[in-house]
Structure formats: C-alpha cells, structure tokens
Amino acid sequence: ASPFGLNKNAGKAGPPTRWLGGDAYQTNISEFDKGIEDSGIGKFQYILFDDCNMTGIEVAYELRNATHHIIGSPTEIMAYGMPYKLLWNELSKVNPDYHSICTNFINFYSNYKYGNTPYPYGTISVIDCSQVEGMVNIMKEINASSSLSIVVESDIQSMDGYVPSIFYDMGDYVRKL
C-alpha cells in the first residue's frame, strides 16, 4: 500500500496504510476481509500479497478471520515481485511448507539482477494468523506498562523509504521501550 502517486481522490479508500492496490483500483483491507467473509467460502489457507508493506500487524489483525496465513513483504517489494515459478510447488499444496517458500524467495532475491546490476534485496514474512490475537494482547500489556514518551521515533527501524516513515519494525519498537 504505497502512498506514492496518490491522486486527489485516493483518500477515499482510507489512509495509505489501510488499502492495497494503486490509483486506479484500491481495496480497503477491512472491505477485502468483509468480502471474503460475505462470500461464504470460509477461511483461506493463505493470502499472498505481491504488494509492498502488507505483512504488518495491522493487516494481520484485519485479516485474522479470513485466512490462516499471510505471505508477503513487510517492506517495499522489488518490481519483479514474487518469484511465482520458484514458489509454485509449495503454493499449490494443500498445506504449504512456509519455511520453504521463504527460503526460495530469499535464494531468488539474493541472486537477483536487473540487467547486469545486482539487486540482492528482498524481504518476506509469513504470519500465522492464529497467533495474532495473542500478539495484540501482549502488545496491549507492553504498551500499558511502558512509558511511550521515552520512544524516539527516529530510533526505531523504519520499514519503508518514506519521509517521514509510516511503517516501523514492531520488534525494534518493543526493544526500544
């Protein structure tokens, strides 16, 4: 969900951290969740996002009842996107090996080149949505017992290239409390 290239009507889909898609087609994450629920098809085994910044706790919380797992990038994803050809063997299984999916993704991007220029960058995350409620409860306890005033935003690892940052590493946030 990138705020770059927003047009004057983009805010209609919600804040830039609450939707997926580009200028032409945007879907609010809560509406996406409701659409899955309303379809009656039940819970997905996984949802794979080939989009930037889609494995934050906010997305996982919103989709916790729609899917068992979320696969995606917690940061910006390279323009090439997901290397589906390498991932398909696992993605097509009833019970994918999520560790293997991550390993194949990392191996691909460790050797990725655009033209002759190496771009060995890529981040992937798999979230087990059955653990999201527990994480939310832990974070409530941590936030209630900590002085948030001591946290210096610029000291927390940013997960994006925006100025100012809008996505942060939750683990680093907790370590800085």
For each feature predicted by the language model, list its residue ranges:
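Short beta-strand segments
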Residues: 1
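Terminal, contiguous helix-loop blocks that mediate binding/assembly
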Residues: 5-177
